[in-house]
A protein has these predicted regions:
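A charged, amphipathic alpha-helical module
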Residues: 108, 112, 116-239, 258
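Glycine-rich, highly charged phosphate/nucleotide-binding loops
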Residues: 37-55, 257-271
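C-terminal hydrophobic structural anchor segments
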Residues: 260, 266-306, 311
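Acidic/His-rich segments in extracytoplasmic proteins that coordinate ligands and/or metal ions
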Residues: 48-120
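Gly/Ser/Thr-rich loops at beta-strand to alpha-helix junctions
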Residues: 1-2, 69-75, 205-212, 287-294
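Redox- and metal-dependent alpha/beta enzyme cores, enriched for Fe-S-associated oxidoreductases
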Residues: 3-29, 203-274
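Metallocofactor- and cofactor-centric catalytic cores in central/energy metabolism, strongly enriched
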Residues: 2, 11, 22-25, 29-36, ...
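Peripheral docking tails and interdomain loops at the edges
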Residues: 297-348
Length: 348
């Protein structure tokens, strides 16, 4: 995000664009188009909607594509395909599995090449001062996020799933922007001004199905159920320690919780639950996300061993046809009742 901001480009992502299109209720048209092209139904719905929109000509041809092997295996199918289809320049960032100094230096070198790629693509010079300024903005945003996180155990702003998703824009697409700094400053202010809620609180893991009615009914503007932190967002706002701006950006990618062993996702959820004093955790197992679905049972078992009640919520954040509202509602209500009972027993 920081280099894209330094280049003065306006980025959009597969997930963000597909969320928007699903919100307009036109996703089925694009899913059918993707199916006609031979893409498997087991592929992530965000990527299938995005591919379908691109194939129907709804999406404009981008100036370039930047992608990585982090978080989503769909990247490795979607972007090479569209790069050839659009005859569009693309840049791939390879992030090693190992988390060490060598990996950071390896990725930092790729990011320096990415800067040159963006200069050639835009025909515009990117100064080192602009790059450093973008990284400094990310440091400020991360510091603000850390401060508000520390307050969450005693402050519960009434919010919605959509509001939580705004933070994903700030720590990923808009990382390094002045807007991201302003967002975290206002978030910190809002949290400070909010009282402690009387209801339950959870840590949310992975993406949020903000369009699904039973999930909205439980969480949106609720005084009974609060999301105190999301691992996806907390990871995006992680602190960067390296002085060199390219190494700092590389550090954030190499040490991403979605890179490497699932153990890091468990440890991050434990850390967030401890800081925020959450009553439980919800892991959203999104359709087609093989990494999360495959690790979900291990994550649940590991967290419950520490005393954190955890629910695996199967569903689809982009294609409502893949999820039963009734089943989701029943499971969520049962989980809420279990948390309420557990809280009463602790207070007794």
């Amino acid at each position: 995000g920081e280099l894209v901001m330094a280049a003065g480009l306006t980025p959009y992502s597969v997930e963000a664009m597909s969320c928007f299109m699903a919100g307009t209720k036109c996703e089925q048209t694009f899913l059918r188009k993707t199916e006609e092209e031979g893409f498997p139904e087991t592929m992530c719905s965000y990527h299938r909607v995005f591919l379908g929109a691109a194939l129907t000509g709804i999406l404009p041809k981008p100036n370039c594509m930047i992608y990585t092997n982090l978080a989503c295996d769909g990247n490795m199918m979607t972007f090479p395909y569209l790069k050839d289809k659009f005859e569009c320049p693309g840049f791939y960032i390879d992030v090693p599995y190992e988390k060490n100094r060598e990996s950071v230096l390896y990725v930092a070198d790729q990011l320096r090449k990415l800067k040159r790629f963006l200069e050639e693509t835009t025909d515009r010079r990117i100064s080192e001062e602009t790059v450093r300024s973008a990284v400094d903005n990310s440091r400020k945003a991360a510091a603000n996020y850390k401060k508000q996180l520390a307050l969450r155990c005693a402050h519960d702003p009434v919010t919605s799933l959509t509001n939580e998703l705004y933070a994903l824009f700030m720590c990923h697409l808009m990382a390094g922007s002045e807007t991201a700094v302003t967002y975290t400053e206002k978030l910190l202010r809002d949290v400070r001004m909010s009282p402690r809620g009387d209801g339950l609180s959870v840590i949310w893991m992975h993406i949020m199905p903000f369009l699904q009615e039973p999930v909205k009914d439980i969480f949106n503007y609720s005084k009974k159920m609060h999301i105190r932190a999301c691992d996806f967002i907390a990871d995006g706002f992680q602190e960067m320690h390296a002085e060199d701006p390219y190494e700092a950006m590389a550090e954030k990618m190499v040490y991403c919780i979605y890179n490497g062993s699932v153990k890091q996702r468990v440890e991050e959820a434990e850390r967030l639950a401890r800081i925020t004093e959450a009553d439980g955790a919800v892991l959203f197992a999104h359709w087609g996300c093989k990494g999360t679905i495959g690790a979900s049972s291990l994550i649940k078992q590991s967290l419950e061993k520490t005393g954190l009640p955890t629910m695996i919520l199967d569903g689809d954040g982009c294609n409502p046809a893949n999820t039963s509202d009734g089943q989701v509602s029943t499971r969520l209500q049962a989980f809420v009742e279990m948390l309420e009972k557990g809280k009463e027993e602790k207070q007794a």
